[in-house]
């Protein structure tokens, strides 16, 4: 099936698909491996997320923010981090064994924005909070949050990227950490790939010590007639139209970023321009499961979650 098939089902039918999948899931709850998601919070009431994200593993930088997902992004990240290719799992009948659990720290406020000079401190304190609560876990830290407004544009460090470098190195606490961060996104697709080449990886993904994830794509359209013979912007196996790069940086001074690329989806193009398309995105979990179970995710967020 195509991604849009699952997204367009009514909630009752989506719930049946999810219910069938849950019967095949085994979560090894004694695992010490966790993925800590720094984002908008996660709504772990979703039937696919509740077995792998306990209430006690949901944190927030500011108590008054709550731990819930006010935006949807954190829950979309969780579906991919928890299950990988969710669509493939739905389409087959194989047992699913999960050897990791999730943790969530809400680092973005429900209203307004954090002060830019606090980005590094918020990230550092949020990671420390989780490590203090569950010090025994083997933890991967995942953050698909970047700032285009406060990007140096040429690879130079910022206070935020420096904080990631310090955290990853274990300079303060002598505990090295795997921190995975998204490269940041491009939304001017008409001039692909020229725009991607001149669009800098965003702050704080210029961090030397973090693993920066960009996006490529294998996504193509099976039935172009459905879209009046439109085409995809990127070729199969090419750089995703969403991905920033470090081509314009001085590679004698600064790192080459992103470090790796994973599936981030493609974009549809016709005579009128470019547009996002569900079939060229990745299926994941929706943050309001009483309305529907599935949503789609794309760009370097999807790639980072992979």
Model-based region annotation:
Residues 18-20, 117-132, 233-248:
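A Trp-anchored, charged/polar loop motif used as the substrate-binding/catalytic surface
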Residues 39-50, 200-305:
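Extracellular S/T/G-rich loop segment that most often corresponds to the catalytic His/Ser-adjacent loop
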Residues 22-25, 66, 91, 129, ...:
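Generic recognition of flexible, low-complexity loop/linker segments
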Residues 62-76, 156, 293-306:
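Gly/Ser-rich catalytic serine loop of serine hydrolases
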Residues 1-10, 179, 214-215, 223-224:
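Basic/polar, acidic-poor N-terminal "presequence/leader" segments
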Residues 1-26:
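Autoinhibitory propeptides
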Residues 108-209, 217-220, 291-298, 302-303:
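Substrate-binding/access-modulating region of protease and related hydrolase catalytic domains
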Residues 24-57, 64-118, 152, 174-176, ...:
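Subtilisin-like serine protease catalytic core
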């Amino acid at each position: 099936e195509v991604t849009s098939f699952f997204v367009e089902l009514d909630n009752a039918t989506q719930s049946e698909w999810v219910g069938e999948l849950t019967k095949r899931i085994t979560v090894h709850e004694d695992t010490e491996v966790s993925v800590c998601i720094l984002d908008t919070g996660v709504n772990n009431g979703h039937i696919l997320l509740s077995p792998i994200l306990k209430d006690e593993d949901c944190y927030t930088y500011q108590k008054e923010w709550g731990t819930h997902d006010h935006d949807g992004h954190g829950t979309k990240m969780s579906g991919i981090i928890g299950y990988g290719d969710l669509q493939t799992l739905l389409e087959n009948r194989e047992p699913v064994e999960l050897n990791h659990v999730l943790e969530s720290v809400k680092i973005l406020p429900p209203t307004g924005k954090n002060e830019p000079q606090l980005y590094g401190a918020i990230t550092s304190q949020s990671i420390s909070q989780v490590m203090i609560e569950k010090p025994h876990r083997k933890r991967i830290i995942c953050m698909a949050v970047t700032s285009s407004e406060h990007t140096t544009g040429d690879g130079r460090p910022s206070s935020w990227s420096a904080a990631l470098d310090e955290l990853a190195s274990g300079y303060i606490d002598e505990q090295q950490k795997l921190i995975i961060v998204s490269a940041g996104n491009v939304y001017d697709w008409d001039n692909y790939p020229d725009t991607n080449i001149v669009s800098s990886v965003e702050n704080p993904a210029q961090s030397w010590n973090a693993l920066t994830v960009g996006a490529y794509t294998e996504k193509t359209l099976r039935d172009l007639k459905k879209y009046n013979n439109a085409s995809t912007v990127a070729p199969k196996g090419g750089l995703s139209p969403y991905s920033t790069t470090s081509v314009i940086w001085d590679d004698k001074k600064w790192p080459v970023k992103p470090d790796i690329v994973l599936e981030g989806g493609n974009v549809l193009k016709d005579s009128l321009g470019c547009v996002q398309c569900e079939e060229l995105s990745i299926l994941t979990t929706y943050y309001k499961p009483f309305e529907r179970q599935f949503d789609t995710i794309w760009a370097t967020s999807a790639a980072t979650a992979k």
